[in-house]
Amino acid sequence: MDDDRARELLARERDRIEQALAVRRDDPLEGDDRIEPGDEGSEDLYQDTFDAARIADLDEELAAVERAEARLAAGTYGLSIESGSPIPDARLEAVPAAERTVEEQERFDR
């Protein structure tokens, strides 16, 4: 994959993640002293827990994009961090921040 295409894909991925983070972090009730902790129902607690987990996932996705951008700058984007093998362009199109081939990722995730 050429560098311009990689930059475009990574920029789009960064934008998607940053927009999702902005939505998750934009809580209009945050800091509202009129709401007592006991007023929040269990549904709110569940949603807060879900949002915190989603924010953590998005933060990790953003970190992966930043690592991919660093690899692009270093000239190693598109090569597996595990084996140095080329990551197929189709995988990079689908997952621009991919760090491993599909097979390596499956082993890593086990």
Question: Predicted regions span which residues?
Answer:
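Residues immediately within or flanking Cys/His clusters that coordinate Zn2+
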Residues: 77, 98
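Interaction interfaces in information-processing and related assembly proteins
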Residues: 1-74, 94, 103, 110
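The DNA-recognition helices of helix-turn-helix-type DNA-binding domains
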Residues: 99, 108
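Short functional micro-motifs and their immediate structural scaffolds
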Residues: 86-88, 109
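Short cysteine-rich clusters marking metal-coordination/redox-active sites
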Residues: 80-83, 101
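Short, non-ligating residues that shape and space the ligands of small metal-coordination modules
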Residues: 89-93
